Amino acid sequence: MKENTTFFAPMIYQKQVAPAIEFYKNAFDAVVLRQWNNDDGSVHVVEMSINGALFHMHEETTRNNELSPETLKGTSIALGLFVEDPHAVMAKSIAAGGTEIDPVQDYDYDYRQGTLADPFGHHWVLQKKIGK
């Protein structure tokens, strides 16, 4: 990735980061780029990439109300992930422990997409542009 380029990199809050790292590796072929641990060895922050799409995960913190969906009992956003084959990624994600919310289907706005919940409560919209 070029330095000084504007791009979007979400920060995903988790109760525990380590189990989420393993899920994203198995479900999305994510790779760990950098990781910072707490004194007790638990993961504090991790920088990851899914096929070049950068994101971070951080332990939830009540200090700034940066909380996980588990604590909130819901989520306020869905993370859109553009992939070559939404059906295949959905199947792989379910096998890794995710739960299908909406099956992958084609929409009249020229997207093929489906939604899943990861084991930590985050919603992912797996999608591909199929029209013009």
Question: PLM ranges: what are they?
Answer:
Residues 120:
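C-terminal catalytic core of tyrosine-transesterase DNA break-rejoin enzymes
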